[in-house]
Amino acid sequence: MKMTSLRLSALIALLLAPLGAVHAGDAPKAEANVPVEITFDAAKPHPEPFLKVALDLVFTDPDGTPQTVPAFWAGGTQWKVRYASPVVGRHRYRTRCSATDDVGLHGREGAVEITPYTGTNPLYRHGPLQVARDHRHFEHRDGTPFFWLGDTWWKNLCKRMTWEGFQELTADRKAKGFTVVQIVCGPYPDEGAFEARWENEAGKPYETRDFSRVNPAYFGVADRRIQHLIAAGIVPAIVGGWGRGDCDGMKLAGIEGIKRHWRHLIARYGAYPAIWIIGGESGGPLWTEVARQVRNTDPYRHLATIHPFHSARQSVTDEAVIDFDMLQTGHGDWNSATGAIPKFKAAYARTPAMPVMIGEYCYEGHMQTAFPDVQRYVFWGSMLSGSAGLTYGAAGVWHASVEGDPGLARVYDSTTWQEGMNYPGSTQLGRGKRLLEQYPWARFEPHPEWTESGSFAAGIPSAVRFIYMPKRGIYNWAGPVVKELERDVPYHAFYFDPVSGRRFDLGRVINPGPAPKPFEDRDQPRLFTDHFEGTDASAWKDYGTPSQRKDGRLAGAKGMVTVLEKIVDADLMVSVEASSDAEAGIILRFHSPDHYLVALYTPSLKAIYLHDRKGGAWGEPLGKVPVPRIGPRIRLTAAASGAYAALLLTDGQQTCYTPAVKVGNVTAGRTGVWLYQIGERQEFGAFELSKAQFAPPKSGPADSAAAMAWSGEYKTPNVPSPQDWVLVLESMKP
């Protein structure tokens, strides 16, 4: 039978128009990593070409490495193969067809010439994606880190999303910094099989429910959209179909039908820089078998996972069939958002290590929930906990909703895709990504010990720190606490507004080591002593819960405010023994129960600091210093002199002290002892009072303009407004 000549077309730079026909003996040229398409014409008719004819090409690269690449039936008498390689040089191929008697398909030989890539598309310039060496992130083949910021477009191959709309949405997401689109090419979620909603401009993808008869025209239209994403530098994460009970692709087509479908997807899109998501809301032995078939069929070894109900890793029966753990953490509002991070951390802790990322969480605007503050919380909370990336979603966009047709069997939202495209969360996540990309973010590791509970921290020791402080409520301007700053490493700090992207400079910060000792313990003559022996308590007055003298102790319960009445002065030093299992405080400059200084140790925070109480309000902790493990009995020494006050603590083995801090209460008052609310009971002993005279020490680092993070703890200035903030500390070169 007459056979037409072999036609070849190179999809250089993803131009949709093919190159002109090339003679069979010639080798077409394609640039590295860019697909080349080769078309074969069958020499004889085949009654069921998609079901009965399998065509593969065995390519051998210049190094002699063979690679089996599946081809796909393109309609009529045509079969096509798409091939790409990072290896420069001449690649030879030979066809291998199940119809061995068809000389147009079987035993054909040829070659492709791969030349260096000269374009600017990062997906081609840096090469295919892979798991990074740290097993926590993704990178290109050349080692360039890949930041996964995904968007959810489950149904955007359907005809409700017009070609013009697809281009508009792609341009918007590219401009905002998105790098991945999760898109279904198979049975859709939230609709029945073979409904009209499934169609694109060329109809449905299959003509039979077992996927034995394909509609090549459908995939021709889909090709243009997949190619357009890649041309924009966006990786298509292709979902092979949905697996939930009400829209179960496995039940629809059977495992053999799903396997045929996946071979077809690999043949069409394997040469592109794609990611495989085997099934949506899928799992169990059958989907694991499909994932194994994908692994064995795909010659390019693309990254693969499952979109799960909860965790991809826990959804498969063999972890070897996936490369990373994709999570779905649930929809809703703040309860779902705050619950997402513990779920992420649990997945991150599983061994052996693999990249973990949230692939579905609270869609923005979904049933009128999960607006931008929720989106920012999940983004920053997961990224600073070790995530390989995040996939965002917006109402309207994921289901390709248009006015009058939301594209859903059960309507969650009537939001159109244009409205969802403009939700502010997508812009704000893009701003966060751009900030992280200004630093070696792929080397960041989570460091929760760098900040207080409720905030998130990550970075590189002695180089850069990121701290995300979620919104604490209205009228709360308190900034986060930075802990464990390295000794003598100068940092530059700034607040980053994750909403607007504005920066607020905080200047330089340094940990010069332990704070200089603010005063010498008991360096003045005694004015008063009390060892609490006997029952005479006439020198004292209880302004809180009653105190009791017994066996050399002054004991009190929560709310204890016991004041020495007879001595009034502004510059005094008090030393007293106490137990370390409850709060212990020394009162200075007491004027009333609502107006005094207190220098205290608290076992709940394991820290010492001062409060300048005024008008019944405590104000911010002053001079807070962490205290290591200490013995059961401690001695506190507190002093106030002029505009400064400080506290020293010792257990006989080790000593800790605050810096001298400036206080607003500078007038003469009385002294006493204190237990507010931590611990059931405190027993004070050996009370000593003397005059005090000291000033803040002059010694310090050469960089006198830097904020002092004594002993490694930095209490940041108030945030510019009560919302969530990102604090960045970047080390300064000498």
Predicted regions and their residues:
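Aromatic- and carboxylate-lined catalytic core of secreted/periplasmic carbohydrate-active enzymes
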Residues: 26-30, 45, 352, 363-366, ...
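Extended acidic/polar, glycine-enriched regions
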Residues: 58, 65-133
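Active-site mouth of glycoside hydrolases
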Residues: 117, 122-324, 328-335
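Short, aromatic/His-centered strand-loop micro-motif at the edge of beta-sheets
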Residues: 614-635
